[in-house]
Regions:
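Conserved beta-ketoacyl condensing-enzyme motif
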Residues: 5-7, 48-108, 235-252
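Condensing-enzyme catalytic core mediating Claisen C-C bond formation in acyl metabolism
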Residues: 1-47, 148-215, 219, 223
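Conserved catalytic cysteine-centered active-site region
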Residues: 34-36, 40-52, 79-132, 256-259
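Short acidic, glycine/serine/threonine-rich loops at helix termini
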Residues: 16-17, 86-88, 144-147
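Acidic, glycine-rich active-site loops and adjacent beta-strand->loop/helix elements
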Residues: 10-11, 78-83, 108-113, 136-141, ...
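A contiguous, well-structured pocket-lining segment that forms one wall/lid of small-molecule binding clefts
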Residues: 200-259
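Flexible, glycine-rich active-site loops centered on histidine and acidic residues
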Residues: 125-159
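Short, well-ordered amphipathic alpha-helical segments that serve as non-catalytic structural scaffolds
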Residues: 28-29, 50-65, 216-231
Length: 259
């Protein structure tokens, strides 16, 4: 037994920043961004916190599933841009929506929602819980260097959620990790110890090696999809729809070509 999706919900801030808007901040233009990244606009929070967005997505998922918050057995939140280190986003979502179940956070960046689904499937399959809320929220605008056109054009803010229940809706899954800190890094500065002797990084925003990110993303996306299809016994012509991570238009096209 794996799981089935009972309902989904999403939320994006109303404020939209276009490519033309970004051209007033950095040396770029709509044509450059559209051709290289495939993004024309992004939703950016003006007032919503990470938890605000997560709550709205969670409430919409619950409504779509037709269940109330007090029927949830577990909440798994995924984020790398939480409002606080503690309490976690999951704990604050639990409080805000009126749930009474355990809640915790996972931090796996772009792939966080997939890791959370797999984690939820484990809880459901061993019979520990019947209904699990998975919610992912990121307020990337708060950790972006808005003078770096290599990153500020890519990211936006928003949240997505799904309510999972017992069932056999999942045919197969495949996760992978390539550890390292040389491609994409988001340092944090919270060390106040007077005895800590290591140098503290002055970088506090997203630092990305675009070329290496592109190479890894194409490899990871295409290889993992092929491995997943093989484990599921599915051929390319059997697949009706692929919903990829949408950070970069060229990555998606190249991965599609390789598949």
């Amino acid at each position: 037994m794996s799981f089935k999706i009972l309902g989904t919900g999403s939320y994006a801030p109303e404020h939209v920043v276009t490519n033309d808007d970004l051209s007033a901040l950095v040396d770029t233009n709509d044509e450059w961004i559209t051709q290289r990244i495939g993004v024309r606009s992004r939703h950016i929070s003006e007032t919503e916190t990470n938890v605000d967005m997560a709550v709205k997505a969670a409430e919409r998922a619950l409504e779509n599933a037709g269940i109330s918050a007090d029927e949830l057995d577990l909440i798994i939140a995924t984020t790398i841009t939480g409002d606080t280190l503690s309490p976690g986003t999951g704990c604050m979502v639990q409080n805000r929506i009126g749930a009474h179940c355990p809640a915790f956070d996972l931090a796996a960046a772009c792939s966080g929602f997939l890791f959370a689904l797999e984690t939820a499937a484990g809880f459901l399959s061993r019979g520990a819980y019947n209904r699990v809320l998975v919610v992912s929220a990121e307020r990337m605008s708060g950790i972006i260097d808005w003078t770096d056109r290599g990153t500020c054009c890519i990211f936006g803010d928003g949240a997505g959620a799904a309510v999972l229940g017992k069932g056999d809706g999942l045919v197969a899954s495949h996760l992978m990790t390539k550890g390292g800190d040389d491609v994409i890094t988001i340092p944090t500065r919270y060390d106040r110890s007077p005895w800590y002797k290591n140098e503290i990084s002055e970088i506090t925003s997203v630092h990305m090696n675009g070329r290496e990110t592109y190479k890894f993303a194409v490899m990871a996306m295409s290889d993992n999809i092929k491995d997943l299809m093989a484990s599921a016994g599915v051929a390319g012509e059997d697949v009706a729809l692929v919903i990829p991570h949408q950070a970069n238009y060229r990555i998606i096209n190249e991965a599609r070509r390789r598949i």
